[in-house]
Structure formats: C-alpha cells, structure tokens
C-alpha cells in the first residue's frame, strides 16, 4: 500500500513560465493524480518522462488489469500543483487529512477538490486500495485545460446526440402523419399538410335545408378493403357541411409532384362517418310531406359504380345480403305511415301503394312480376303510363321492405372492374298515395346505375360496353330534365330516355321536387370518376342556384368552361352547316358581276344541304341497344368521305376566287 507522504501545494502557475523547468520536480516512480475520459480522478505511477515533447507516461491497475496512458505536462500540473515548485514545498502550510473510500471499480475515487501528488516508499503501482490523501485546507482553484483528444470526443458526442434528437423527431412526425410504407408517400404528406391548414366544422351543426325544388347533396364513402390493401390514398376532404375538396395529384415537367385542389359547393356534404339516417334527414325527409300536398317528389342516387348508391338507398350489406331496414326506402316508408296517422292527413283516407321496376337497355321490366316487360305510352291527356305495372297496396313498413327485397333479388347486376356486384339497371321504387282510386301524390326513389367512362370499359365485353353506353345516355337525358326544372322552362326533354319518360310527372308542374345524392369514392385511383360525378352534380347545383339566387356557394375553378360545351352537338353541327351554306351565296352576291366562276359554287352548297339528313338516318338505324354499330360506322365513314369531297371542291373555288381578286387589284 502506498504511504501517506504528502507534497506541498504549489502556487498558481504563470502562463509565461516555461513548462520544461518543472521537469526537475518529476521523477520516475512518483505517484500523481490523473483524470480519466469519464471524469474519474485517481492515482497513477509515472513510468516515463519525455522532456522534449513535454509529456509523461503513467500506469495504474484497474480490476486486475494494468493500464497506462500518455498525458501532457500541463494537464498533470493542473491536477498536481504541488509539483510546480520545490521552493514552495519548504514553506507549505499544514494539511488536513481526508479519507476517500474507493468505489466498486478499483481506482475509481471521485472528489470535487484537487488531488495532491504523493511519493510512495517504494516503486509500486497503485492498486486502488483505500488511501488517505492530504488536501490543503485552502485548496488552490485552477482552470483545467482539456486535452485535444478529450475535446474531440466531446464534440463527436454532441453531434451524435443532435443527430439522435433529429431522428427521433422525424420518426415521431412520420408516425403521426403518414405511413412510410405507402408508395404515394409524398402525395399523402402534401394532403395531410393541406388538411392541417383548413378550418373544419362539425356535422352536428347542420340544419335542415329550406324548402326548394332542387336539393343536391354529396356523400363520401370510406375506403373499402380492396383499396386499403392496395394502399390507396383518401383524396377527398370535406372541411365544412357544404364544401367538398378533391386533391388531384399531378406531375410537373421536372417530375416533381404537386396537388391541384378543386373545390365544389352543394347544399350538404357528408363525410365517410355519416350514417344513412343523417343523410336521409337532410335529403329525402323534407320531401316526404310534399306528396301529401299532391306533390311529385323524386330522390335519386347518382355516382360511379361501387361508390355506395345501393348502400344509401337500400341499406348496408352483410356479405351478399342487404339489410333493407336502414336504407332510404325504409326511412321514407316510416315517415309516410307516421304522417298518415296524423289528424291533418288521416281525414283524407289515403291508401299507399308500392311499385318496383327497372330500366335496362332502354326497356322497362317489372321487378314485382318476375321481370315482365312493360310498355311506356302516353294517354289522351298526355300523361305517361307504364302499361302492365303491378301496384301492390301496403299498410306497414314491413310490407314495404318485403317488396324491396323481392325487387332487389330480380334486379339485373353484373361484374365490372370496380365492383363485383354492380347494378346494371336503373331501379325505381315508388310509393303512391291514392284517394278514392285517384292519384294524390307520388314519391319516386331511384337507384341509378353507375356512370362509367369509355376508357374503363375498353376491355369489357360488347354487351357490357352497350350497357354502359345506354346508362350514360339516360344520365345525360336526366341532367337535361333537371336543367329544365331548375330554369322553369316550358319544355322538358323527357322523351330522350326511358328513365326521364317514366319520371315525367316529377319534372313537370309546380309541385315537383327533386333531391339528388351524389356518392363518390375517396380513393386516388377513382379520382377521374369522382371529378366527373362532382362536375355533374355541380352543374345541377348551378342550375338550382339560378332558381334560388339568394344562396351563395363557392364554385370550382374553371367551371365555366364545361357550360360552353353543354350545347347539343347536333344543333351545333346544324348551325355550322347553315353558316357555311350562307357564306357562299353572300360572296357570290358581292362578286357576281366580276367573275362568272362563282355560279358553280351553288352546286356544292346544294349537295351539302341535301346531305344534312344523313345523321338522322344513322341515328334511327343505331337506336336501341341492339343496333348494328359496325354498319353505322361504315355508313358514317362513307357519308363523311362525300362531305370531305364537297368541302375540298369549295376550298379550291375559294382559292381561285382569291387569286382572281388579287390579280384584279394589281391591275388597278
């Protein structure tokens, strides 16, 4: 064990005093205090002194292992100031002993004061046993300088801690905001960032809409299992009770992604958490009482196939079975029978009848009579009648649900690229009120077939393509009828489709009320179809705003452009042809006395006007689902070739006329 021989405490070193002069105080074998990299201070034996480079080598034993290191002289003097001067050793002050108890690790003695170097009786390596070190009563406080190695270690440690903090922040942000396994990671991040900046309002603050003839609502469904498996993104945001936003992902020329946010405004917008009861409260429920006042109400669901139309109208699906008790069919029936029992309408002695039929391929079939084919005719009073349609009297909600289940079991369905059980027909369920055998009011609930793009059915069978064409044709006709209803036009083009023909009484008259529920899919893969649905519904909403100018709404950017394309193509074509025919005689009249060649232009014009009937003939041939499309295409190409020849002849004669006019102007 080392002896308790103490060296006197030296005064504070002057920075100008050369360090090499202090090597006279050092000798191999003395015991000095050193500081480890983990801030521990303990004793070690000097084994080597390098006077040229000003460093010493020390050794010590720790846990039975002999260790050593090189230390700068300045660092040793900071911890052992007694070695600074021999003269101060002679005049040292009395010291008081302090006992330091070693820790579990040998050589691990910690103290807040400075250590005083000691010289042992013999040259032995400190083993870390219990030692009593003499510390001055008034210790000299000196600033210890860290070695370059220690400073570099501390610098690296700070950088490491900073990197770890940044990584933890990034991981926490990713865990809260986005799923890093999503292939559309960047798009999801931009959508979430945009949503955080929006001020959303709760659906509970909704109030029932005021009475009006047209009501347009939008309902968003949640992501289904297939979309979740494909890691599809939800690109639909409903920030308030009447605003729908679509975040369309696009790509710049430099391949960077960005969002194009399109905003639509409607009477009401329902998010994916809204129930059928909530949707019914603000859509069909305000129209129920109108049929007791001799009104004709219509509520139809429109949207892409697989967007939730049948779920909204009929109820939720449990596998392949449908729970019809929570659909709009059942909710309307409940309110109808409740109003029948009120004193105001009980005295009318009204009876309720139910009908259920579908429109498939331009033909009408009775779903309550084994899909019997029906005829749609007009009677002497110009009222549309569905000949042979079976009407069954109902007295409670259960009987209505039985009719709905029977009709749904017979309804035409098929498989598409989006939905394995897609409805391929328009289903119309009607609740009719009669008083004394005469019609009193009628509520038509229409579950429309899903609208489809031609690009989606390009690889489908011919039958499926013809179905989609007929569906889109009837939906366009329905839009034109709603336009006429919103503008209070005297003429309604209901004859353009069987759907609008059977619903004629819902579009004509002051007691007609219409409610549209546009269902949309939230997935990014359905973005194009969703935008088409919202544009269709927004057009209906714009028409409703013309009838109710006091209601303000935010229209989507660029919505004026589709209105310019809304004109009928046939009428536009006819007006263009008429202008071309008129321009030629006008030029003839002006230049009749100057050139005799212009008289021959009347022949192409007459040929053009005689062929104006070609499109009508082709339409008659292609009318209906069973039309021969190949024959119509061949006939159209033949007529177009003839017209191209006529136009080429006119072009040559106009060029000749221009040349003659130029020559005449040069002569003058």
Swiss-Prot record:
The keyword ATP-binding applies. Residues 213-543 form the Kinesin motor domain. Phosphorylation at Thr-125 by PLK1 is required for activity in the correction of kinetochore-microtubules attachment errors, while phosphorylation at Ser-204 also by PLK1 is required for the kinetochore localization and activity in prometaphase. GO terms for cellular component: centrosome; cytoplasm; kinetochore; microtubule; spindle. Residues 585-604 have a biased composition (Basic and acidic residues). Gene3D superfamilies: Kinesin motor domain. Residues 585-605 are annotated as: Disordered. This is Kinesin-like protein KIF2B. It comes from Mus musculus (Mouse).
